């Protein structure tokens, strides 16, 4: 029902809880629902058992990537941790994308993290959650553009409305953030993301999709196709 009438033909389901059981459930849902084209799940990347877990889960063709909720880690250096990075270094062998979930203040450490893995494919989620409700853009924009210099990083356009209060959920207020993202990554490294169902605290799926379509309506049809499906198909090997 959520995507009916939107023209959306397929989605990627992304983890929310950091338990393997949720990854199992997402993979089961993908196998039973044709519109789910892939899963970004959670696995304990810092675990000593991560090699065997990756061997097991990567055998499931629905698994396209993994994500850790780094934004929720109390240790600001977590993303630079030895064990965590050992787990990240194994993903390329299994052709898995790593989705980066952080707050904007974690961008500097994220740049250092990405630099340790030049051959790993990364997708930055929610444009690194800038402080839209505070109308702050400079520091986030500077760090985002620095991260974007790493061509193995793409960026998911999502999560913006939940970072803004009701006054900043208009296209006009969000436009500078869209402009920064398109300047940093270009159409070839941007992906549309809904952040559903989290987005529902601020807007509906269809409303968010319509807003993003309107913002990028001035791009060529080929560029819009890249953002709304071609990049996802290529990056996640759908």
Which positions does each model-derived feature cover?
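An N-terminally biased module of ancient metal coordination in phosphate/nucleic-acid-related enzymes
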Residues: 1-25, 30, 210
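Catalytic pocket-lining loop regions of alpha/beta-barrel enzymes
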Residues: 78-191
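Generic structural signal for well-ordered alpha-helices
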Residues: 1, 23, 27, 51-55, ...
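Conserved, mostly hydrophobic/aromatic
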Residues: 11, 26, 39, 66, ...
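Mid-to-C-terminal alpha-helical segments outside catalytic/metal-binding sites
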Residues: 1-10, 179-180, 184-191, 200-238
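A generic "structured core" feature
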Residues: 46, 82-83, 87, 123, ...
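Active-site metal-binding loops of divalent metal-dependent hydrolases
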Residues: 16, 43, 127, 195-196
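Active-site gating/metal-coordination segments in enzymes
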Residues: 18-105, 112-114, 156-160, 167-168
């Amino acid at each position: 029902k959520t995507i009916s009438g939107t023209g959306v033909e397929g989605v990627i389901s992304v983890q929310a809880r950091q338990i393997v059981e949720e990854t199992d459930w997402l993979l089961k849902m993908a196998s039973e629902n044709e519109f789910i084209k892939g899963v970004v799940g959670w696995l304990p990347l810092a675990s000593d058992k991560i090699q065997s877990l990756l061997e097991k889960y990567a055998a499931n063709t629905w698994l396209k990537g993994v994500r850790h909720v780094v934004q929720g880690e109390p240790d600001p250096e977590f993303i630079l941790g030895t064990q965590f990075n050992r787990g990240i270094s194994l993903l390329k062998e299994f052709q898995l994308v790593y989705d980066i979930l952080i707050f904007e203040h974690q961008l500097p450490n994220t740049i250092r993290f990405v630099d340790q893995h030049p051959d790993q494919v990364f997708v930055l989620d929610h444009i690194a959650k800038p402080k839209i409700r505070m109308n702050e853009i400079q520091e986030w924009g500077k760090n985002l553009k620095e991260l974007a210099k790493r061509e193995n990083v793409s960026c998911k356009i999502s999560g913006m409305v939940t970072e803004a209060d009701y006054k900043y959920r208009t296209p006009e207020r969000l436009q500078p953030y869209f402009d920064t993202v398109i300047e940093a990554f270009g159409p070839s490294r941007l992906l549309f993301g809904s952040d559903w169902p989290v987005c529902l605290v601020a807007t509906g799926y269809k409303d968010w999709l319509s807003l993003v379509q309107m913002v990028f309506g001035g791009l060529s049809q080929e560029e819009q196709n890249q953002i709304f499906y071609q990049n996802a198909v290529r990056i996640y090997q759908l």
